[in-house]
From Swiss-Prot:
Cofactor binding comment, as recorded: Binds 1 siroheme per subunit.
Listed Pfam families: NIR_SIR (PF01077), NIR_SIR_ferr (PF03460)
InterPro entries: CysI (IPR011786), NiRdtase/SiRdtase_haem-b_fer (IPR005117), Nit/Sulf_reduc_fer-like_dom_sf (IPR036136), NO2/SO3_Rdtase_4Fe4S_dom (IPR006067), NO2/SO3_Rdtase_4Fe4S_prot (IPR045169), NO2/SO3_Rdtase_4Fe4S_sf (IPR045854), NO2/SO3_Rdtase_FeS/sirohaem_BS (IPR006066)
Keywords: 4Fe-4S, Amino-acid biosynthesis, Cysteine biosynthesis, Heme, Iron, Iron-sulfur, Metal-binding, NADP, Oxidoreductase
Protein name (Swiss-Prot/TrEMBL): Sulfite reductase [NADPH] hemoprotein beta-component
Sites where the protein binds [4Fe-4S] cluster: C434, C440, C479, C483
Statement: the UniProt record of this protein carries the keyword 4Fe-4S: yes
Gene Ontology CC terms: sulfite reductase complex (NADPH)
PROSITE patterns in the cross-refs: NIR_SIR
Amino acid sequence: MSEKHPGPLVVEGKLSDAERMKLESNYLRGTIAEDLNDGLTGGFKGDNFLLIRFHGMYQQDDRDIRAERAAQKLEPRHAMLLRCRLPGGVITTTQWKAIDKFAAENTIYGSIRLTNRQTFQFHGILKKNVKPVHQMLHSVGLDALATANDMNRNVLCTSNPYESQLHAEAYEWAKKISEHLLPRTRAYAEIWLDQKKVATTDEEPILGQTYLPRKFKTTVVIPPQNDIDLHANDMNFVAIAENGKLVGFNLLVGGGLSIEHGNKKTYARTASEFGYLPLEHTLAVAEAVVTTQRDWGNRTDRKNAKTKYTLERVGVETFKAEVERRAGIKFEPIRPYEFTGRGDRIGWVKGIDDKWHLTLFIENGRILDYPGRPLKTGLLEIAKVHQGEFRITANQNLIVASVPEDQKARIEKLARDHGLMNAVTPQRENSMACVSFPTCPLAMAEAERFLPSFIDKVEGVMSKHGVSDEHIVTRVTGCPNGCGRAMLAEVGLVGKAPGRYNLHIGGNRNGTRIPRMYRENITESEILDSLDELVGRWAKEREAGEGFGDFTVRAGIIRPVLDPARDFWE
């Protein structure tokens, strides 16, 4: 779909200001260290506001009280979001106990937020606690390097596949890819860990002095599970196994979901198949994809800087040939693979070596002690006795992994006693939202705070039409940046203004089709009216086993998005 209008390999023109900022930052140092000592403001100033993102942080404020503070002639209540680097979402119980303690003692909100990129975030870190949080992470073998801005972000890996041995192999590759693509600058260690500056000059052999044109996301996915939503990502390694052993990967490049309202130069896009590669070429190919995007990505317009736009501009075959040239390989034909679902398997699943995995549903990934449901305390109590690890899933849930048979009852009792195993409907299990208000500065409409009650109402609609045992993959994202992955849902809501959303339908359960906008800028009641009509038709007219999204396409209710660069906005 990308060979119709081949364009220039490099976009000429005035570089965006972000490129100036990166070039002048001295390999991401800026004046962050000096800014830390400025007690006159709770935030970071100038370029540092953006540079801290390379160190895994975003500067935010509490939007619920922004107007009140302005009326009092006070600056916004600045606080940082910090996102940990956690390839594949695997975290030890020792590490969990440390982050639980920090969240309780040193953040405004006291919560841990699991994200759909398989890691955790702290919200509400005051400036005085910014350095301590990095030092706490380092003390337990973690960091926040490259979890935001123009780098390869946290690498995802299927959390709980049918073959646990395959997970172990795939997870090791997720870690290797993450480490290989990390920035080499010593700025992180110097600023946060007080390591001395050495005389040698920084070099970035892979990322370059101005790093990537835009954010870059990578996954390792094990079919038939598409839990990590590969089509939301720039670079995807689809595991191919023979006799239960990993032998290589299919490579898919150029997925991405973020758009800008009304900007028809932006669109969501599924990833393109490049071919199959044996394991020994994995790191060379990963580096080649990244460096090709580094050199060819649009540095004049950040709205058109992601890999998906580079592929559309130069053509898939041209990009693929350059990756082959740089990696010194020829891709083999894509090997067969299929996705049959992407939801987590809530409850107990038996793995290898007589070990068990317990997947706990965490609504919106928000871990906090709620009235009657002390989730945060419950996970801490499990961490105190569990000898295995936790795995954070790309559906914002948590797996208590590698539980011996003789410990199952003990772990389950702790989970039940703390409200971690309450019954959940299939519809709620298959719904997700980004954080949005009150902390996200980009939020246009509620998402996390809106979703629970909205799903109550959706369940009412489904009950009315006799399909309560079914589910519709439902996602809410507070703005068109798309962190809630609404652009791969069967029903996707994209925030437009307070209380108003664009309604997208026509995606599928497996996450391989982009949904199209069905109604624009509508209220919750209007959304529910539309769903009432559509679910009613689905209940009566669907074929055996037909999901809601597939039905809306087959019935002609919505046209499928086939070539996003040309038909996403039609």
